[in-house]
Amino acid sequence: MYNKNNNNNNIIDDNDYDDDDDDYNYYNNNNYDYNENLISKDTKKQKDLEKEPLSKSIAFISIGTLTLLYVIVELGAALYVGSLTLLSDGFHNLSDVVSLVIAWWAQKAAKRDSDNFMSYGWARAEILGGLTNGCFLLSMSLYVALEAIPRFIRPEPMESGLIFMIVAGSGLAINILGTIVFACTGMSHAHSHGGGGHSHGGGGGHSHGAEKEKKKEKHGHSHDGADKEKKKEKHGHGHSHSTATTAVGINSEEHNHDDHDHHDHSEESHGHSHGGEKKKEKKHGHSHSHGGGAAEGININDEHDHDHEGHHDHSEENHGHSHGGSEKKKEKHGHGHSHDGGVEKKKEKHGHSHDGVEKKKKKKKSSGTCLGMDLNMFGVFLHFLGDAISSLFVLITGAVIHFTHGKWTEYIDPAVSLIIVIMIAATSAPLVKRCSMILLQKVPDDIDLDSIRYKIAKVEGVVSQHDLHVWQLVDGMTIASVHVGIEQGREFQSIASKLRKIFHKEGIHSTSIQPEFLPINSFTGGATSDPNFCIQNCVDDCEEEWCCKKSADRIRMRNFNSKNSNIVDINDI
């Protein structure tokens, strides 16, 4: 036993996963390669995206041209009346034109294929565009703020409020149009680079299984030797059962039931009782997905994960489940069930995932922006939203100057300029920060590295791990790499499959797992005792280039301080 926590409760087995991921089950049960299907999904998505850039190009060109014409008019008016507010708004709109050009280029560049010079392609062009847009806004805000402060010391009288109103009104209309266009364009074409996820709500689950031999019933049913002569009652539940009848063959059944009361099953079958057993019952919407391996040779140990409101009834090898069995009236519930019933001679365990009554599963943060746009489009959207608000303030400023008189009106222009600057900076700073964190390859906020390390350590055959890195290529596309120490003699492919499941459940679909087959330490009787032991470094020649050089430094120091008989020399391994 080389793993310190090597016992039944701490070792991850293939069947320790809830298998509530429909995509993974579908590909796994049908002998498909999951990663290849993810690639095919991304390829299809890429082809769909290639058909869409026309609308974005039209939006960029039309709004950009209109904005450029307006900037020329606004800057001319600002110089004519000597207004800092109009000047700042004009420069703001000019930065919009520049940002539109950058964003348009980023959209085009992001669709280029990878080559020998850009192995990832130009995917990060959108991030670069969003960062540039944010920096333009922040620099413009700083410039206007520096210009506005002297105006409070030496205020200048303002006239021609009517010109303010005409110019600001035109700008407000253009910016509102741009905001709507890019909000709609960005949301309708938004995409996530995660590998095709699904969202399942209560009562609306689905099941991927073999399409052959599907049967539809409108009454009771039995599984794998259940008594067919039992009384069949109407049900009000939608069930999708995918039962593996042999090690390879798959038999799928679909049942539609009305006013479901109970299921009765014989030995080694699955009995379920949904609904109250004592008094009145309200409607329940259930969606079930059952996958049961019925071949005698199958040995599956799925852990229990029950989140039921009510109780369970179990007897010998026949498992009866009562979901939501309260003593009085029942509330409406929507349940999504995923059952993977592997039949063993004396033990059966079920994995349940319930959406509805008290869903306790942790929800992950969405990786996109609040409107579902990529960061590049979100930057353009922020530009026009900020412009629309600033144009509104300019319009108010013009109205105040035109309809009121007094010494205090001289402070309106610089005051409004500072308000606009604060609003623009408040919306731009988070965009710059987010783009910067992606370029700095920060770990995404919804990823817990300690949790991943813990799960990796539980995998049977893994004795050490180090250099775990998780980062984002673009917003929504997370990548990971890790070095794992494996006992000599272990099959790497099976261990890698378990590790990929761990990353997959964390929303990481692009992983690089580097195995390190560790030697047996004759002095300890097990694998090397250093959990950070790394044998992939060439200690002598490329000390500054190691990806895990800290580990090798510890090995060097241990070798230096050890007796000759205990030296661990990487080059001798």
Swiss-Prot record:
Tell me, in a sentence or two, what this protein's role is.
May be involved in zinc transport from the cytoplasm to either intracellular organelles or extracellular spaces.
Q: Which SUPFAM superfamilies match?
A: Cation efflux protein cytoplasmic domain-like, Cation efflux protein transmembrane domain-like
Task: Please give the InterPro entries that the UniProt record associates with this protein.
Answer: Cation_efflux, Cation_efflux_CTD_sf, Cation_efflux_TMD_sf
Biased composition (Gly residues) is annotated at 193-207
Q: Where in the cell is it found?
A: Membrane
Compositionally biased intervals (Basic and acidic residues): 252-279, 301-329, 337-346
Q: What is this protein's name? A: Probable zinc transporter protein DDB_G0282067
Record's PANTHER family?
FI23527P1, ZINC TRANSPORTER 63C, ISOFORM F
Which domain of life, per UniProt? Eukaryota
GO CC annotation, single: pathogen-containing vacuole membrane
Q: Transmembrane ranges?
A: 58-78, 86-106, 126-146, 162-182, 381-401, 412-432
Instruction: Identify the residue ranges that face the Extracellular compartment according to the record.
Output: 79-85, 147-161, 402-411
SS bonds (residue pairs): none
Please provide the record's keywords in A-Z order. Ion transport, Membrane, Metal-binding, Transmembrane, Transmembrane helix, Transport, Zinc, Zinc transport
Q: What is this organism's lineage?
A: Eukaryota, Amoebozoa, Evosea, Eumycetozoa, Dictyostelia
Give the start-end ranges of region Disordered.
190-367
GO terms (molecular function) for this protein are:
inorganic cation transmembrane transporter activity; metal ion binding; zinc ion transmembrane transporter activity
